Each structure stands twice: as structure tokens, then as C-alpha cells.
Design a protein with these regions (language model features):
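Membrane-interfacial helix-loop segments of redox and metal-homeostasis proteins
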Residues: 1-138
Length: 138
């Protein structure tokens, strides 16, 4: 199955996105945003979790996802890895729904394109994982 390799590629997309945001966060700068809401989102109180920028947490999420996808490339039949990937991407997908639809749209009234890229990547990871798990009949 190509699914583990797709997961690997998607994890790299997420890594690139969060690395870019983390770089700007580290320099205390706001990246240029085509849709105009990045400054509102990235400077809000909700952009940090106990003082840690969410871009850093996203970076860790995608590093771990990359490692998990790599292990799935090596051991594609591992039930534990497939279930772990399903749980991990499911949690990521749920959080991204909360972050985009509740926090950004309802609370802040603004959208960040980089957050949207991360959310779409996370949903694609979850969808690919569901397909992978179902096609391998746990």
C-alpha cells in the first residue's frame, strides 16, 4: 500500500508549515498572510498553550507523525502502529476542528492561512490513516 508513504509526505508538508510558523514565532514576527487574519490569530492569547506557541506544539506533532509514518513504511502490517496512527491522527483532526471552527472563526473572527494548511494536512493524515486501517482489516 502507498498509504504509509502518503502519510510520510503529508507529515513533511505539516513539518514545513509549522517550521515556517515556528521560525517567525521565534523571531517574534508575523508572516505575510494572503487572507489577512494571521496577525489576529498568531498574537491572540489562544495562540499559546501554557506559554508555549502552538506552532512549536504543531512542530512536535508533525515530527512524531513523520516518525510514525516512517515506522509504518518499515512495518506496514503492524497492528499497533496502525492503531496508534489512527488514534494520533484522530486526536489531531479533532483538535484542528476545535482550533479552526471554534477558536478562529467563533472567538477571534479571523483565519490564519498557515493554520488552515496545518488543519487540512491533519485532516488528510486522518483520512489517509482511516483508509489504510480499513484496507488492512484490523
Amino acid at each position: 500500500s502507498l498509504a504509509p508513504y502518503i502519510l510520510l509526505a503529508l507529515a513533511l508538508v505539516g513539518l514545513g508549515d509549522t517550521l515556517y510558523l515556528s521560525y517567525f514565532q521565534y523571531l517574534n514576527l508575523i508572516p505575510t498572510c494572503a487572507i489577512g487574519g494571521c496577525e489576529v490569530v498568531l498574537t491572540s492569547a489562544q495562540s499559546k498553550f501554557f506559554g508555549v506557541p502552538l506552532s512549536y506544539i504543531g512542530l512536535v506533532y508533525y515530527v512524531y507523525m513523520f516518525c510514525l509514518a516512517f515506522l509504518l513504511c518499515v512495518e506496514p502490517r503492524s497492528r499497533a502502529l496502525r492503531l496508534g496512527a489512527l488514534a494520533y491522527t484522530g486526536i489531531g483532526a479533532l483538535y484542528s476542528i476545535y482550533a479552526i471552527f471554534y477558536v478562529q472563526l467563533s472567538v477571534l473572527g479571523a483565519l490564519c492561512q498557515f493554520c488552515l494548511i496545518s488543519a487540512l494536512t491533519t485532516w488528510a493524515l486522518f483520512g489517509t490513516t482511516i483508509y489504510y486501517v480499513r484496507s488492512n482489516r484490523l
